[in-house]
Each structure stands twice: as C-alpha cells, then as structure tokens.
Amino acid sequence: MRNVSLSYRNQYAMSLPGFKPMIGDVFGQRSGMGAMSPGLDFAFGFIGDGYIEKARRNGWLLMNDSLATPATTNRTEELQLRATLEPVRNLKIDLTATRTVTTARSVQYMYEGNPTTQSGTFTMTTTSLRSAFEGSGNANNGYRSKSFDRFCSSLDRIRNRVEARYAVAVYPAGTALAGKPFNAENGGVSRYSADVMVPAFLSAYTEMGDGGLSIFPSLSHLLPNWTLRYSGLSKLPWVRDVFKSVNISHAYKSVYAVGSYASYSTYMEYMNGLGFINDATTGMPVPNSMFNVSTVSINEAFSPLLGIDVTLQNNMTIKAEYRTTRVMSLSMTSVQINEASSHDWVIGAAYTLNNFNPFGGNRHRRVRQRGRSTVAGASQQKTGSNSRNTSSSGVNNDLKLRLDLSLRKQASITRDIATMTSAANSGNTAFKLSFSADYTLSRMLTMSFYYDRQTNTPLLSSSSYPTTTQDFGLSMKFSLTR
C-alpha cells in the first residue's frame, strides 16, 4: 500500500429572519434578553438545527404570524476515502470511495409545533458488477434482463419485511384511527412505494444488498471504485524486442444517487424513522417513510474495461480500448426502470515519417564552409547527429499519419414494473473512420489532409433510417511566427 487519505467535509449555513437582539462588541455578544445573545456557540459556529428552538425559547425571535419568511438551514456532508496500492511492481491500483449528503430544511418557527419541510440529495459510490455483464436482451427475447427479473421477484418479499416493522405500531394522534394498532387491511405498505422498490433495486443491481431496507444506505454499505494501470509487460525480454512500451489500463466507476427529494407535509412519525402519511385517495393513514422520492439511479462506467497502449520500436503508437456505460433510473412516479447503455470499441494508430521526401532523393546544394566548397547532400551524414532528421533547408519534413476506427452501440430500454415487460425506446450503431495526414513543407507552411466517414444504423427502423456521412478536405497552414 503506497498511501491512504481520508477527508471529511461538513458545511453548515443558517438564515434566521426575525432575530431581534442586536450584535454586541465582544465576540458579537449582547446581554439584556435573559441570556447572552446570540451565544458563544453561534459566534464560534458550533450550532445546528436545534439553535432555532433555543432562540425561540429565549425570546430572541419575532413571533408574528404576518412574518412569512421561514428559517432555513443547509448542510453538506462529504466523506472521501482514497488509497493507492502496488501489489506487484509496475501495477498501480487507485481506490476511491465517496459519500455526499445535502440537506435543506425550512422551519416555520412562528407557528406552533415549528412546521418543518426537508429536501436534499444523496450520492455514494457502490459496485454493480453482478448485473454489469448480464446484457440487456434483444428484440427476439423481449429485451429480457436477469437483473430486472430479480428485482420484480423480490418486491413482495421486501414489502413483507418493511410491513413487519409496523407489527406493533399504533396509528398516530390526529388521524381517524388514532391510538389503534396498525392493521394492513386499513392500508398497508405499497408494493410500488420507494420504501419497497429502492431496496429491491439495490439488491438486484448492486453488491450492497437491499441497503438495510433504507433509501439512504449507511456508511457500512459504502463500496470503492478503482483505476488500474500496469506497465510491466515492456520489461519482458521477448516484449522489449518489439515494443518500447506497453501500458494496460482499466477503470471502474459506479455511483448510486437519489435525486432531489422532499418530505411529505402529512408525515407523522411513529418511531425510529417509521411513520405514516395520509393516503391521497382514502385519506387513511398508511405506513410510509418521511420522504417523497421520485427517482433513484445507478450510473456505471468502465472507462475503459480494457485499454492497451503500445509504442513499437519504430515509434509507431497503437491504442485499443473497450468502454461501456450504463445508467439505470428507477422512477416511482411512472413505476418503471429506464436503462440506457453504450458499448464502444476504439482502435487508433499514429506514425511519423521523418524527413519524408515525395519528390525523390536528397536535394544537393553547394555550401561554403571556411573557405572550402562541399556538397550538402553528400556530406550531410557527417555533420552531426542532428543532420539525420533535418533536410538541407534546415527543416524536418515530417509526415504525421493518424488512423482511428470506432464502433459505438447505444440502446435505451424501458422496463415496466407493473406488467413486467420491456421495450426499446431508441438506439443506434455508429461506425466511424478518421484519417489525417500532416506534412511540413517548410518552416512556415504545413499541409493537412483529412477524411472522415460515419455510418449510423438505428435500432428501431420506425423512428429513423440509416445514414452515411463523409467529410474530407485539404488545407494549407501558413504561419508568420516561425
């Protein structure tokens, strides 16, 4: 292990309108309203959301129903872990794990009970390898996915586990069933609620399991992403004879994210994060978490899954990569999983022809050196090491060639959870060929030629049609700065 680093950032901000005490001269403190205000904890930044209740209790706030501006707080917590490993020589592995939570609260302190709303976002690194290589299916099998089948089959099991947590619960005060024991016949945990579908989503697509039946998994479920680089092959004798360098690369990234969420206005907590909301149709209290989560997603990328970069002994460079990306979004609003994926194969080569002369052999010219006449073309190899790469005009007439080939396949699939069916929305297969040549004619003049060809074949012929585009040209670049 080469090095390990840990960083934690906690940023907190508060806006408290209607604060009556004036600011004092010593640490901003002033006495005269029962206690020293705004308090040393405020002066040194050691406050939290509980400070609003403290200010209200000490009479520091303007309690007027006409004051419509609530107190607001914003908190950002970010944890980042980094480690660099070198298990064998020339093999380096970088591990990264991050977890970021943002929370915004709005408190109507001027009303009884301090009505509070909360919103925020959540992201953390994870791994989703168990579903990465299963494929998305095709038109022949109805775009069947093993991960989606696992997800659908686990919904009832997880719903029963969530509902079991309410086994000894009683309905909260202020409802038609206040004080009575919970009965699922009056309205149980919905099969398509975020409390059920998000843990099933994590269990089917990632290695973190069901996240402890939580929409916001704890630190114990944090998993790292990684980058791998290996350059040791060029040290082998039989490889060194052909290649100057051989580099192999691999990188993996997977991030679980909860889009913007907000608390339910009718939420009534039972205990330990369990509570009830009023059903929009019946008005009866039903078990549900505090937050209305509309979308969660997993963003995965192999960039690349495998990459090889080599330099031959003649200085030709060749690069080949295979990249994949996948974005899976679970929507509680439409009760669907949208899966967008891409696969890229890229091959590129570059080579430079030094002192390339398309017009024949060396151009001879007579030059005078210290009183004697010589033929520049005949004596060029004896004038020093730099003359091998320099023409008689003192310019390297290099021809730089580059060829790139790429194949990209994209597909977007919608999976309906209620009907357990899948259908392709869009997709495309694109093949691209790019060739370029740059030739240095003189110190000030460079000639360039390029040719690009791209072919697009849509996945669904009903939405578009195949196209082919070609682009080529010749340019001359004249520079006055050389």
Regions found by a protein language model. Give the residues of each.
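Exposed, low-structure sequence patches enriched in small/polar residues
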Residues: 1-482
